[in-house]
Amino acid sequence: SRQHKRSGRESLDCALMLQELTDMGVENIITFDAHDPRVHNAIPLKGFESVSCTYQFIKYLLLGVDDLHIDSQHMMVISPDEGGMGRAVYFANVLGLDMGMFYKRRDYTKIINGRNPIVAHEFLGSNVEGKDVIIIDDMISSGESMIDVASELKKRGASRVFCATTFGLFTNGFKKFDEAYENGVIDKILTTNLIYQPEELLSKPWY
């Protein structure tokens, strides 16, 4: 579940789900790239492990991209928001790279589709000009934030943009990603096969 924190009088659905599983006799839970691993505090006396997919992403980059230079002069790891900092820090440490992050500036006077709309993506980090960048996140939902972040990096002079995410949902289809690829905003999107991958997705040149 993505709902790892409460807003107002909402229920904490992820915690409730974990507690119901343990009430049915489950002793240990293994998941992949939990949206927030701290949710295991809902079942402190049971086993809970969140498996990172960092190795799979690094393996593809090393085997699938020939002219990649993995050093801090040529590459940088980017977190698309403050919630994914831990994931990006780990990825950057494994590869020995610098890290940057974006934070979402929202308009809290409005609610659109149940959320406060994002006004701008503000960047915190060193210069990305001329560097390949890896945007690391746990999921692509509609993909709007990922494309916005990639666009901001391109405006700042980034060379190639690779998006690595554990779960590729693509809830609004692939059109925006096709356009982003054609316009040179993104070069490659990496996901795992932990959820269903339609044939249309597998045939995309950017996937």
PLM regions with names:
Residues 1-207:
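PRPP-associated nucleotide enzymes
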